[in-house]
Structure formats: C-alpha cells, structure tokens
Amino acid sequence: KSKIIVCWAMGLTQHKNGVENIREYINLLLLKGAIGKPNAGTCPVRGHSNVQGDRSVGIQHFIDKEMNERIKKHLGFTPPDQEGVDVVGSMKAMYEGNAKIFMCLGGNFLMAASDTEYTAKGIQNCDLTVQISTKLNRTHLITGKTALILPTIGRSEKDIKDGKTRHFTVENSMGRVKRSKGILKPAADTIMS
C-alpha cells in the first residue's frame, strides 16, 4: 500500500482549480509516504504524442535570456524576447479577436480544450488557421476565414532524406527518451517531417 501512483491528464491540469487539485494529490501522496519511491508518486499523463518532450527543448512559460542567446548563437536568428500566451490565454485571445492567426503543429486542439464551444468560436474569429497534421481530426472542421491543412509524416512512417533514414526521439511522461524510426512508406514523396 505504500507504492501509490496518482495519474492525471490535461483536463485536471487545465481546470480552473487545477493547481489546487494537483496540490491535494501531492499532499495525499506525501501523507502516504509515496513520493521518492520506485513505482510510486506522480504521473501527469499528456494527451498528445511527445508533448512531454516539449519541455526538454526549451518550451517554457517564461523567457530564458541565456537560452535565447544560445539559440541566437547556434541557430543564427533572434528568438522573441516577449512572453507569449499559454493554451488558455491563446483561446481567450482568439475569442476576443486579439489573435488573427492560429497555427497548430499536430494534436487536436479543439477536442483537447476544456471548453470546446468557446474554443471553436475563437478559432472561427481568426483570419488564418494553419494546421500541420499527420491525420485529419475534428479541429480541421472548424476554421478561420482562410484555412490550410498541411500534411506531415507520422512517426510510424519512414523519414528519408538524401537517401538516409532519419530517426526521431520521443519523451514519455516518465522522462524517458526513446529513439525510433518509422517503417511505413509515406502517402507521398512530397510529404515532409
């Protein structure tokens, strides 16, 4: 009974009382002595493929000036130095007409959002919606004034460039990184990763 694990998904994380709810889960685990033990503790489950890996490459809720300098030095461009908005903030900005373009890299934004109707109205307020996706989903049915759906290869498909098979990595909710490669032929040679 001391090996307790509590799992939760994005719905709880993004709930208006999300911080308080998760804090109580943590308190329960602390009371039961289930933090810091193998096969016990917290397990925030992410709804989209490799979303956990976003943190590893520097996607954060704040601007890290040192990281921006390293990006500028190594990649040759100046990244933004002003904070953007998170998912809830972006939905509000679209709904209020303050965001004109919605660009979605994978995922099913509309169905993952906590308030589907509010999110749909926000997306429809945009001048342009661009979705880069491996497969069609319900979010593609709700568009701005102009809409683009751009296909990309999925992780089950071969990614070949200059005759060489490329690999990718996926980080799971436990922070484990796995190297992998696709085995299926993409639908067209023009579809890129």
Model-identified regions with their sequence ranges:
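Non-catalytic alpha/beta scaffold blocks inside enzyme catalytic domains
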Residues: 1-38, 45-193
